[in-house]
Amino acid sequence: MLLQDLKNKKIMIWGLGTEGQSALRYLKRHDISRDIIIYNDTPMEVPEEFCAYVMKSGEDLASLLNSVEVVIKSPGVSVYKDEIIRAKANGVYFTSSTDLCFSEIKLHQPHCKIIAITGSKGKSTSVSALYHMMIKQGLNVGLGGNIGRPLIELIDGGYDYIVAEISSYQAADLTVSPHIAMFTNLFFIHTGWHRTHDNYCRDKLRLIYYQNRDDICFVNQRNPELNRFISEYDGKNLFYYNVENGFHAEGKELFYQQEKILNINDLKLCGDHNLDNLAGVFSILQHLRLDIHQAARDMESFEPLAHRLQKVAVINGVTFINDSISTAPEAAISAIKSFDGNIAVISGGIENEQDYTDYAHCIDNNTKVKMAVTLFQSGPLIAETIRRESQRKDLKLVEANSLEQAVISSYEELKSCGGGIVLFSPTAPSFGFYKNFMERGQHFIDIVNKLDYK
């Protein structure tokens, strides 16, 4: 849907978070419609700039939906809600700020190319690295989506490129696809919003559903689940990375065919797994005909994102790593493999039917993991799985009552054996315990900063 199609329509903004507020500001600034209802699932204090609009919450949602023509939905609102399914059947049109941006840019700004990256893990770092290297080579680039600014704010920016991180929530109801897409991987995650794992994977892949013959998609050949579902899109322009005749990661190095491009040890990024994603990023840069060797040099100045294998402090030989972004066992497995020396790993969050068997095997097979600490709702299941799958007698397994206890126990253990890494890699979402992974990561940082340095 184009913005001009919203002119004088009866509109509902569903969800007054960051995206909802940006959408409302855009409609207001361009005088697109004055017949707008704001709906939030729970009561909230409306910012003063929006006080002129009707605000609803907790009322008869079905009646409200039937009273409007268009709903601009926030990403947190699942497309699988019964109310949405019924409203669509009654002719109510649903869109989002992401879809509005993609529509406007692709149909009205042909000079601007949209590059969108998604995946279960690695999308934020991939998007940020791509943006960093494009800016370094002098391109006019906007950054938005699930990172940076809401995409609707970039429509009037006059950019030549828009680099977007797209979540499964944002991809699920797209009606326009980006010019260039990249998939990092698919893991078992987020089934609550999507109802099933298959829905989750197909919602991710909807990012390329509307790509045409001039568009392109880069796919990580090394991720089995991604390749299982991408096979449904054989008719699209799919190009694979992490293959021998293209960009691929080997050990701590990134290659193009037989030529070494960079070494992870020359970067500020922690984690060899980042090279898998950089193979996709460099594939995009090559497609844009940018200088690959210059890009490799520019990566050396790239600053890692907070809460993603973030080095917090070193105290008495113990290094504290904040990986709060880790919301799946696969992320923690990659994190463990990223470090040498003694490791105490802290994991646990909300229980969302994750399978921790591979995580337990990783701990069992890595004798450098001296202690595993579990906590929160999923803690008992993680501990039970480790006990069942691990044969190690030297592994210390602690079920903590709080994050503070987990940090202190890990610190004391590693300090007593000459130092090491305290790795906070939760393996599960934070909802119910923290507002988001950033708040969770900051709590870890605050605890570390209060430790006794003696």
PLM features per residue range, with description:
Residues 2-11, 22-26, 30, 264-369:
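Nucleotide phosphate-binding/pyrophosphate-handling subdomain across enzymes
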Residues 357-418:
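C-terminal helical cap/extension that packs against the catalytic core
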Residues 1-116, 137, 300, 306-310, ...:
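Short, basic phosphate-binding NTP loop
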